[in-house]
Amino acid sequence: MLNFIASINELFWGAILILLLVGTGIFYTLKLKFVQVRKFKKGVSQLTGDFDINGKDADHNGMSSFQALATAIAAQVGTGNLAGAATAIVSGGPGAIFWMWVSAFFGMATIYAEAILSQLFKRKVEGEVTGGPAYYIEELFNKSFLSKILAIFFALSCILALGFMGNGVQANSIGEAMKNAFNISPYITGAVVALLGGFVFFGGVKRIASFTEKVVPLMAGLYILICLIIIVINYSNVIKAFEAIFVNAFSMKSILGGFLGMGVKKAIRYGVARGLFSNEAGMGSTPHAHAIAKVKNPVEQGNVALITVFIDTFIVLTLTALVILTSNIGDGTLTGITLTQKAFEAALGYSGTIFIAVALFFFAFSTIIGWYFFGEANIKYLFGKKAINAYRILVMLAIFIGATQKVELVWELADLFNGLMVIPNLIALIVLYKLVVSTSNEYDKLHNL
């Protein structure tokens, strides 16, 4: 089973998806005149514009821009930053980190476009504001039958990729971390995480927004601080770590007969795959949060959205990678969260393992909340609000099952379903690009940007 899924992913995550993802990012970068550079400062200035620690702004009409940002980051900053960075390094070498940066830079333009479209096409479903790629995919080709099929395909893929398999990955990493740090059975961990998740799920959008708004800034800030401390401790290896990243990304051993050899192919495959799983640009996941932000203009949420990719990949994921690469503990036998824990343990002792276990619990659990929410938007699209309670129970079951499965199989399945989401979303982004560009340009003229 594992080998079969891995073979499909090798084909799926080969040149086609890589070209689609990076190509779309390059396309929007050029069309929007390097929007990720031009509007970076603007996006940062909007980050805390309407912060509400009590989550009072979240209701059936949506949530505040900051809460949408926090929900998006909650989904992005998870095992993709901790276990995913380690998996990328082991599977694709240090060079995979470089390709994460490349995909993230162009992904900032992609997610800017996703946020604008999700805002433009959000709607009320049975009295509640909702939105996401399925809603703008449906607008393709004059709302033809084909566009409806693509929208349904995306919605189903999203529910499977995030609500079920994706959350299984998060639970799997939590279970492995808790077993390594505290020798707690994955069955116990799975049950606890499922019940805690259910508590938030059944609280609706207000409880979700309140949770992410409070937890995300605290957990990300503390994690960044600890990473910086470890990198300072390992300062003598920092230059070597960057050398390994850049040299491995373009290793001469990779050139074979005019084609990319296995070295660079693996670095790109795992770098882009893990990069997507981490920052989610182009996947079509975070637009569900950005869609329901209460903003005056769709572009305002686009400005905020591109900052989320920067925080996720260029800050959190990069710091994780540097901790691993400067620790000198990788021998090829450690994978996933175990490698990350050992890197922290090398600098901080056993307390490093404890810290990663606790950090991963909060990172992954917040991602579970975010991904549940994204899946719920597609449940509403396909079946209406009547199916939400059944979906909540099934996600809780997926969390419990995911916590007890082998990490390789769960990761490979997540890659597969993530890829299935990408295709219809990128088709919509390309077809609707004129709308994105015109909306962005109008805003820029109005604000002299």
Model-derived regions, located:
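Extracellular/periplasmic helix-exit of transmembrane alpha-helices
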Residues: 112-126, 228-244, 252, 256-259, ...
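Flexible loop linkers connecting adjacent transmembrane helices
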Residues: 34-63, 87-97, 109-145, 330-347, ...
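N-terminal alpha-helical transmembrane segments of multi-pass membrane transport
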Residues: 1-79, 90-95, 107, 400, ...
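Membrane-interface loop-to-helix entry segments
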Residues: 20-27, 32-44, 154, 171-178, ...
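Alpha-helical membrane segments and immediately flanking helix-loop junctions
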Residues: 53-90, 126-134, 138-140, 156-159, ...
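Transmembrane helix-loop junctions in multi-pass membrane proteins
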Residues: 31-36, 80-85, 162-174, 197-211, ...
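Helix-loop-helix module between adjacent transmembrane segments
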Residues: 24, 28-29, 103-127, 138-172, ...
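Selective recognition of specific alpha-helical transmembrane segments in multi-pass small-molecule
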Residues: 106-114, 191-205, 216-236, 269, ...
